[in-house]
Structures are given as C-alpha cells and as structure tokens.
Amino acid sequence: MGSLWSKISQLFVDAFTEFLVSVVDIVIFLAILFGFTVAGWLLVFLLRVVCSALLRSRSAIHSPELSKVL
C-alpha cells in the first residue's frame, strides 16, 4: 500500500512541477513579447526624431531660396 501511495504522490508532484514549468514558460514568453513591443516603440520614436530633424535642417538650409521664390 505504501508503494501505491508513493506512486500517486509522485504523480501529483510531477503534475504540479509541469504546471509550474508551463506558468514560467508563459511568463517568459510574455516578457519577450513585451520587450519586442517596447523595442518597436523605441525604434519608431527614434525614426520620428531623426526624420523630423532631417526635415527641419533641410527646410532651414533652403529657407532663403524658398523666400526668393515666394
């Protein structure tokens, strides 16, 4: 009877261990997904800053020419 109880308890321990491993896997997956999301936001922000800086510098360079045309 003790051997049967030992096997049943080991089965529950294994099931609980698998449950914890799956929870940890889900948390790791969500953390990676969040990291990619933040990296994408940062990339878009940097692209906007660079593009706006380039457009501002170009308009500053060509402003006398534009004022002659206008």
UniProtKB/Swiss-Prot annotation:
Intravirion-facing ranges: 47-70
Single Gene Ontology BP annotation: monoatomic ion transmembrane transport
Keyword Translocase annotated: no
One Pfam family it belongs to: PRRSV_2b
Main location: virion
A single Gene Ontology CC term: virion membrane
Region (Endoplasmic reticulum retention signal): 2-15
GO molecular function: channel activity
InterPro entries: GP2b
Membrane spanning stretches: 26-46
Residues exposed to the Virion surface side: 2-25
Sites of N-myristoyl glycine lipidation: G2
Protein name per UniProt: Envelope small membrane protein
Originating gene: GP2b
